[in-house]
Amino acid sequence: MLTDLECAINSLIDVYHKYSLKKGNYHAVYRDDLKQLLETECPKFMKKKDADTWFKELDINQDGGINFEEFLVLVIKVGLEAHEEIHKE
């Protein structure tokens, strides 16, 4: 049986592939698919930055796609913001 953390990691991978496979590439989420991912999976965190801003910030190697490592930067940033929100309440 998987632990809660293992399930969470598998969920992150599944979400990434859900959007990376839209263009048939396991290794890249492209600009329009990142926009859809952000709007669908974390709309609460789209209030401060639009999809284009996120894309420019995340595409560290500037290859025109968000690889899984770059996606994890998004997860960290959104996770930190969510953690702050939880402790405000």
Curated annotation (Swiss-Prot):
Q: Which GO terms describe its cellular component?
A: calprotectin complex; cytoplasm; cytosol; extracellular space; intermediate filament cytoskeleton; plasma membrane; S100A8 complex
Assembly information from the UniProt record: Homodimer. Preferentially exists as a heterodimer or heterotetramer with S100A9 known as calprotectin (S100A8/A9). S100A8 interacts with AGER, ATP2A2 and with the heterodimeric complex formed by TLR4 and LY96. Calprotectin (S100A8/9) interacts with CEACAM3 and tubulin filaments in a calcium-dependent manner. Heterotetrameric calprotectin (S100A8/A9) interacts with ANXA6 and associates with tubulin filaments in activated monocytes. S100A8 and calprotectin (S100A8/9) interact with NCF2/P67PHOX, RAC1 and RAC2. Calprotectin (S100A8/9) interacts with CYBA and CYBB.
Where the record annotates domain EF-hand, the positions are: 12-47, 46-81
Note the SUPFAM superfamilies from the entry: EF-hand
Under which name does UniProt file this protein?
Answer: Protein S100-A8
Tissue specificity annotation? Found essentially in phagocytic cells.
Give the transmembrane ranges: none
Q: Which organism is it from?
A: Bos taurus (Bovine)
